[in-house]
Amino acid sequence: MVDFKTVQAFDFQGKTVVLRADLNVPMKDGVITDNERILASLDTIKYLLGHNCKIVLLSHLSRVKSLDDKKGKKSLQPVASALQNLLKNTKVHFCPENTGDKVKVAVNQLPLGEILVLENTRYCDVNEAGEVVKHESKNNAELAQFWASLGDIFVNDAFGTAHRRHASNAGIAKYIKNSCIGLLMERELINLYRLINNPPKPFVVVLGGAKVSDKLQVVNNLFKIADHILIGGGMVNTFLKALGNEVGTSLVEEDLVQTAKQILDSDKDKKIVLGVDQMLHASFKDEPGVECVVAPQWPAELQGFMSLDVGSKTVALFSSYLAKAKTIFWNGPMGVFEFSNYAQGTLAIGKAIAQNQQAFSVIGGGDSAAAAKQLQIADQFSFISTGGGASLALIGGEELVGISDIQKK
């Protein structure tokens, strides 16, 4: 049940709307390589434009850590251009600033039915002297008040940052009278709440990716709601080491080995299922690997090798659980997905989930979503989230602090 006010709660006619969208798209040399997040924000933008209002659009792009980062390579200008190409009949303006009098003037002069994209909100994380001040990322009150002062109504549609308390989401909501969530945010919450509120059983979760630390909270919370937690990717090595298995030079979070052991010891119902074999290579290279069964000791010729993907036995094991599932949540690749030799595990798991058309299946963003796209099976999943970290936080039982100050119904 989504208890926040939605866009349907307000009359936007003639108003100035501050819209926080998640337009954090991947770029290479100033060119957008995947516009999925821009496309995902269009429903809300078009809804607002249909109600004849001004839109002041805020978004972050990547992390900004230096003055060099503010010299154009992390600018939202290409995003504004992409938006203009998608909204042929709407004028999209770009403002190279995001605070100060120039912004106020630009907002005041903006005609109804047009959009003003302000510069990357994270430019405010580095001041003019080059000091890292994190005014956006640490929810600076003065910055939040300035952005709140620009509009009559705040619409937060940036699910990707819903788990972060930033000036451009939580901050604005605190200092503006009227606020609501956008259509994308509403869709995300409805689908993800289906996973945690009495999901059809069996509920199978697939976790991958490099780090255990990112997913510890989730694993602990999932014990309460999931039937099986399948663990692959780099994070499985920390669990395998905790059980006394050989991991060679694989990625392991040494400081969490003991924590992983405690999690496994407390798993009385044996909900956690670890990979049983791995694809190994002598170094971190995209070259064919060797399949090896998980064991306390690897063969002598594989000493010092590292795991770069799950093996075929793990794929078969995980697929057997996924075939019987009624609810599935998948977050994180099974191996080094960007290497073609080590993308097979991730692609196979994607196929296994897509084949189970009886299940309510959700992908938690990131590389898992990229895998579904690569396989051209994205439409066979019930829902693909736009926010990997935010979806994990919600499934992990955390409060989404970036939206908690939005007005309730």
Swiss-Prot record:
Main location group: cytoplasm
InterPro entries per UniProt: Phosphoglycerate_kinase, Phosphoglycerate_kinase_CS, Phosphoglycerate_kinase_N, Phosphoglycerate_kinase_sf
UniProt-recorded name of the protein: Phosphoglycerate kinase
Top enzyme category: transferase
Family: Belongs to the phosphoglycerate kinase family.
Cell compartments where the protein resides: Cytoplasm
Single GO molecular function: ATP binding
GO cellular component labels: cytosol
Species: Mycoplasma pneumoniae (strain ATCC 29342 / M129 / Subtype 1) (Mycoplasmoides pneumoniae)
Keywords from the named record: ATP-binding, Cytoplasm, Glycolysis, Kinase, Nucleotide-binding, Transferase
